[in-house]
Amino acid sequence: MSSIARTTAERFHFDRERLLALAEGNHASYTAGRPFPHIVLDDFLPEEVLDAVLEEFPRPGADWFAFDSPLERKLASKDDSIMGEATRHLLYEFNSAPFIDFLERLTGIDALVPDPHFEGGGLHQIEPGGHLKVHADFNRHPRTGLARRLNALIYLNRDWKPEYGGALELWSRDMTTSEARILPLFNRCVVFTTTDTSYHGHPEPLNCPQGETRKSIALYYYSKDDPAEAAGGDHNTLFQSRPGEALPSIEELTAPEAGTRRPAGERLKAGLRLVTPPIVVEAVRRWRARRA
């Protein structure tokens, strides 16, 4: 990539007026989205901005946190020390006032709060054979206690073919039907409302060639008010069974074969994390830090 293109990426800022016009033009489509409010926006960013991010995207390795269980096999990182300048700059732009105003206008959800810590978000990467079973997301920010309201996903996969799989599936509230399948195409932005029943994932193993990965940026937004549909109570990720599918038990999740790349202690913690509200996990972490 030329130095001019990289400089452009590192100086990129959202155009407030363009974003607000985009939000106005898509608000009705967003709210009408089924099985829950969502929108797919292609060609969302200048291509040179995402090209710069893609060029510096970290390869799989020890710097990533590996989720490796029958429920999910993926890599994630919120550590900006392994990110390049263009990536860090773009992440900060997604937390900026113009982008927050865009999300509020698009979705009708007021007083959204971004997450500078990128808890659960940041960079995601899935290798061949990886997957993420259908689920509803954790509903409370582990540090602030704010209610989770929105997901925004930016895909970074050039020349992605349908046969590679990896489509984001949106499932009905009763888990009988996948009502939307969204391929993770380069420069595609997906925004959707998160509730206790906004079930989504890509449950089938990824079938891309060796050396390729499914790359994305994941961004989550919060508010002080719970969504009207909230069932009450904090929860972590709520995995769901598709028709004819049986999900593993906690015992199976913590068995040695359930996470061959992690020691037993890490497997146990991962299994407990699935059933423990994130705000409780964070409280325990802080208590341990004070005692250290």
Mark where each language-model region is.
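Non-heme Fe(II) oxygenase catalytic core, chiefly the N-lobe of the double-stranded beta-helix
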Residues: 55-58, 82, 91-148
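Eukaryotic charged/polar low-complexity linker/IDR segments
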Residues: 151-153
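Catalytic core of Fe(II)/2-oxoglutarate
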Residues: 2, 143-148, 158-292
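A structural signal for the main folded, soluble domain(s) of proteins
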Residues: 72-77, 106-115, 119, 124-131, ...
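N- or domain-start disorder-to-order transition segments that initiate the globular core
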Residues: 1-27
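Non-heme Fe(II)/2-oxoglutarate
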Residues: 18, 22, 27-107
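Proline-centered turn/helix-capping motifs that create local helix->coil transitions or kinks
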Residues: 61-63, 110-113, 158-162
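Active-site rim elements
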Residues: 39, 85-93, 137-142, 175-179, ...
